[in-house]
């Protein structure tokens, strides 16, 4: 497929986006417009058609995948299990984590250590809730997605060893959820099912 795209002089930005996409992509090449569609979940079978064949994309988007969403921001979390877009189980909540201290000196160091302890306690609690919600579905989960702030999610994943068992089914894109509460879960599953479309002439 790469050689075919190269022959058709696909812009470098498009071929790079396709190469870096964890889910693959589908190229629609018309006489006036071209589109790269990067679906939310991996394309498992390659194909080529001289007609506008949308069946593979249609089939993918109508799969009832079992999804785990784990959304974390400092002081807030939301965890949900979805069958397709239907919520099966969830837990949302808050925890105390102070904002960063900008002043220096010994008091700042004490505050930093105190804040790190708050984060550790918060992450431990969220990890336990993640286990409670995801473990009953662990063997059947198709994909796991994370949402929130990148640094917070990375720190949380390092501490929550339970989630490592889902690494093989974890998608690398980060859902942009500002408030991981009940409404945030609804936003999260909509974003989880969203495709990225790039058009060029």
Regions found by a protein language model. Give the residues of each.
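Terminal alpha-helical anchor/extension segments at protein ends
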Residues: 1-201
